[in-house]
Amino acid sequence: MGGLSVGSVVLIALVALLIFGPKKLPELGKAAGSTLREFKNATKGLADDDDDTKSTNVQKEKA
């Protein structure tokens, strides 16, 4: 199962351009990018918290 091909991405971009128009498209891209960045930071924070919890539990077991 592959990802999106170049042709698919171009088709999606053209449909988005037709639906939202050229003036609204940059705003939508910026909003989508910032949302994705926040999501990645949040999931990274959760993973870091999980790693900290595991290392604390291992240290308690050794003591």
Curated annotation (Swiss-Prot):
Keywords: Cell membrane, Membrane, Protein transport, Translocation, Transmembrane, Transmembrane helix, Transport
GO molecular function term, any single one: protein transmembrane transporter activity
UniProt-listed GO biological process terms: protein transport by the Tat complex
Main location: membrane
Residues spanning the signal sequence: none
Phosphoprotein among keywords: no
Pfam families: TatA_B_E
Membrane topology according to the record: Single-pass membrane protein
Transmembrane regions: 1-21
Annotated localization: Cell membrane
InterPro entries with a match to the protein in the record: TatA/B/E (IPR003369), TatA/E (IPR006312)
GO CC aspect terms: TAT protein transport complex
Subunit structure as annotated in this protein's UniProt entry: Forms a complex with TatC.
Family: Belongs to the TatA/E family.
Known function: Part of the twin-arginine translocation (Tat) system that transports large folded proteins containing a characteristic twin-arginine motif in their signal peptide across membranes. TatA could form the protein-conducting channel of the Tat system.
PANTHER family: SEC-INDEPENDENT PROTEIN TRANSLOCASE PROTEIN TATA
Protein name, entry field: Sec-independent protein translocase protein TatA
Higher taxonomy: Bacteria, Bacillati, Bacillota, Bacilli, Bacillales
